[in-house]
Design a protein with these regions (language model features):
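Long, hydrophobic alpha-helical segments that serve as membrane-spanning/inserting helices
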Residues: 1-2, 6, 27-236
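Hydrophobic membrane-insertion alpha-helices, especially the h-region
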Residues: 9-23
Length: 236
């Protein structure tokens, strides 16, 4: 009887250990699969970050040109020198309001699966989250404000009053000079210029965070010691 009980206990223990080992192996395989998928997630996020760095540099350059044109116009219309209408119109034509909206698809996909938070290192998660949940969201808000200010100043005010001159139609120099030297125009220009300057600051801050995230992603991928990952980094 004792032998039967002992044998039964051993069999039960063997079954229990077998189930436990099987569960452990399945969990180990699942974790490895998720980590491999995270590598692909990070590759995709890095591709998005690279594209965003290229785009944000172009937007920064464009807004620097716009800010310089604003400064030129303000200097001309507030000086005592004779206003050269053709010159100021050339600067007015440079005024637009280009905005930046980052690519978020790869980050959102990885975040929705939980892989990023579960398997990536803490610093990488922190900086990626900061980029998308802080810098991009703040920049989206500023982009929308910039759009509204630009629309009001350029489309609804400048274009409405002297659009004909900007488009090359005949104009009276006196009418154009009166428009540019009016205090209303100067105030609107100062408001627009201030918005350009503020938006440029947000762009530069976001670019700095993009560069930080890019470096961390490259370091993380390289640390996986997988030849396909290293080759992807090398030739991307």
């Amino acid at each position: 009887m004792k032998n039967i009980l002992a044998r039964g206990g051993i069999e039960f223990l063997a079954v229990f250990l077998g189930i436990g080992l099987s569960f452990y192996v399945e969990q180990w395989q699942s974790d490895n699969e998720q980590k491999d998928l995270l590598v692909k997630d990070c590759q995709n996020i890095l591709t998005d970050v690279d594209e965003d760095i290229f785009t944000i540099n172009k937007i920064i350059d464009s807004n620097n040109i716009i800010l310089k044109a604003c400064d030129n116009i303000q200097s001309i219309v507030t000086s005592d020198e004779v206003i050269l209408v053709d010159s100021i119109i050339l600067d007015i034509k440079k005024l637009t309001y280009p905005t930046f909206f980052g690519i978020t698809r790869s980050y959102k996909l990885s975040y929705s699966t939980g892989r990023l938070n579960l398997y990536a290192n803490e610093k990488l998660v922190k900086e990626i989250s900061k980029l998308y949940d802080h810098f991009y969201e703040r920049l989206d808000i500023n982009s929308n404000i910039y759009d509204q200010v630009g629309l009001k100043f350029l489309d609804q005010y400048v274009d409405k009053n002297i659009g004909y001159a900007i488009r090359g139609y005949d104009y009276s120099s006196k009418e154009i000079i009166d428009f540019f030297t009016n205090k209303l125009f100067i105030n609107e220009l100062i408001t627009f210029s201030g918005r350009v300057s503020g938006y440029l600051q947000r762009l530069k801050e976001t670019k700095e965070q993009l560069v930080i995230v890019k470096k961390l992603l490259i370091d993380y991928l390289a640390a996986q010691n997988k030849s396909e990952v290293i080759n992807w980094i090398k030739y991307s």
